[in-house]
């Protein structure tokens, strides 16, 4: 199977599993918004965002390094060396974090200290096991594990939030147990002990892996800072209720991020494997064209359908979130395209540029938030995120020319439709929204028809085997 078909197959297999977690996220929205006040949900969302900020610091993203180095590992001995070094470093990092966090939160007498620490440890374990499954080529196991994660999250959330009425701590406990159980299943299926041995620990390999992963940390942290600064400053300047509304508004644009995530997981591997191929420029351009059309279709489709589905998922106390969704949807588009460019930088093992661009964007995001949130509230947070993501997109696009030239063609029809869709969205006239949705649907199908055909054949053949 050629590289492009393999990428499509892996993307779909990953999507089948990961889609369950996104479906879960939306199935649970009515539960969250009915059982938790905007202030409570804002607190939970802040803790989740804080955990994503701490994770790269604790692990130095060694799981990402492990995945990349496993792609180049030609024999079992090389794989054992990479995996052993990763696990050894992760265990040390986790122990140090637990000790420091336990002391700090113990002194502060923070209400959610214990479960929050366990929540972070469970995320470390899950990230490590997922990277191991992907790196060893067990894509179906990776996909299946995400399905297990989604199903267990539903059950546990109902138990902890509805039956036990534990509120914010219940959400944290549910996710902690689901993450841990899923990670254990993956590690048992992979027979982890066969890949880990004290004699296979090599400092030289560890240093090489850290040289790859450490520059990724500022990149990841900066993306998180863009999100965290919004939430932190909204909480400080406008209250936890405003943060809760902003968090719900972000739930819908995250559909796009999740859809791209299906592709991105497979793309990092594919972009690296084809690097030595003479046809890599043609391959990159072909994928670039397809992913742009696909993401633009989702942007238009999500904005067009939102007037009809928003009230089905969200309690009326969160109605203000409706106004910010289009801004965040467009912002996520630029995030995803920046990540696409990042996949190429990763293939060339140039991770430094990824960090420098996002650090600059994070600083701009913070400055905008400080200046404008006191006056414009959630709108300021939304636009600061859009501006920051756009800056990363433009700069990475410029720097990419040093490695590869991607062909560009301005899509006038898309931008005209986007403006028209935004007008009907905010006018919120039923007839106009219906007409606009039909037009957008036709456009999305027409522009992605060949892409959908490319997906269907290899995926069907893969599962027949």
PLM region descriptions:
Residues 69, 123-146, 329-360, 400-402:
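Membrane-interface junctions at transmembrane-helix termini in multi-pass inner-membrane proteins
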Residues 30, 58-74, 253-289, 342-347:
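Helix-loop junctions and terminal segments of transmembrane helices
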Residues 425-465:
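Membrane-proximal transmembrane or re-entrant/amphipathic helices at the cytosolic face
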Residues 1-3, 114, 140, 164, ...:
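Interhelical loop/hinge segments that connect adjacent transmembrane helices in multipass membrane
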Residues 144-192, 359-364, 378-398, 441-444:
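Hydrophobic alpha-helical transmembrane segments
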């Amino acid at each position: 199977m050629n590289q492009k078909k393999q990428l499509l197959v892996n993307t779909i297999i990953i999507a089948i599993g990961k889609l369950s977690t996104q479906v879960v996220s939306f199935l649970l929205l009515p539960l969250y918004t009915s059982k938790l006040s905007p202030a409570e949900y804002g607190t939970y969302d802040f803790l989740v965002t804080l955990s994503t900020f701490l994770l790269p610091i604790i692990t130095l993203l060694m799981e990402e390094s492990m995945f990349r180095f496993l792609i180049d590992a030609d024999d079992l001995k090389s794989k054992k060396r990479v995996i052993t070094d990763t696990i050894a470093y992760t265990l040390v990092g986790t122990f140090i974090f637990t000790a420091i966090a336990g002391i700090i939160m113990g002194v502060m007498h923070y209400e959610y200290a214990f479960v929050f620490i366990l929540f972070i440890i469970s995320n470390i374990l899950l990230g490590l096991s997922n990277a191991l499954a992907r790196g060893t080529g067990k894509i179906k196991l990776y996909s299946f594990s995400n399905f297990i994660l989604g199903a267990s999250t539903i059950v546990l959330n109902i138990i902890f939030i509805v039956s036990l009425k534990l509120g914010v701590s219940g959400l944290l406990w549910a996710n902690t147990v689901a993450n841990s159980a899923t990670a254990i299943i993956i590690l048992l299926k992979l027979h982890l002990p066969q890949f880990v041995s004290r004699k296979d620990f090599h400092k030289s390999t560890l240093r090489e892996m850290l040289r790859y992963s450490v520059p990724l940390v500022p990149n990841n942290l900066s993306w998180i800072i863009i999100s965290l600064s919004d939430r932190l400053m909204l909480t400080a300047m406008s209250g936890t209720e405003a943060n809760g509304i902003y968090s719900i508004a972000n739930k819908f644009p995250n559909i796009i991020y999740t859809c791209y995530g299906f592709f991105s997981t497979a793309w990092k591997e594919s972009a690296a494997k084809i690097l030595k191929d003479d046809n890599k420029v043609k391959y990159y351009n072909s994928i670039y064209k397809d992913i742009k059309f696909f993401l633009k279709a989702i942007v238009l489709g999500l904005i067009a359908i939102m007037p009809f589905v928003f009230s089905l998922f969200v309690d009326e106390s969160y109605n203000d979130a409706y106004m910010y969704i289009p801004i965040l949807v467009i912002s996520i588009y630029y995030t995803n395209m920046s990540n696409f460019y990042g996949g190429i930088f990763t293939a060339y093992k140039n991770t430094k540029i990824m960090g420098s661009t996002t650090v600059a964007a994070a600083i701009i995001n913070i400055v905008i938030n400080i200046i404008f949130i006191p006056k414009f509230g959630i709108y300021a947070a939304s636009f600061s995120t859009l501006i920051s993501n756009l800056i990363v997109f433009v700069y990475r696009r410029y720097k990419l020319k040093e490695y590869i030239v991607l062909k560009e063609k301005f899509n006038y029809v898309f931008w005209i439709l986007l403006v028209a869709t935004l007008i009907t969205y905010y006018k919120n006239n039923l007839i106009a929204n219906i007409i606009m949705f039909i037009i957008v649907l036709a456009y999305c199908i027409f522009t992605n028809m060949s892409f959908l055909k490319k997906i269907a054949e290899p995926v069907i053949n893969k599962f027949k085997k």
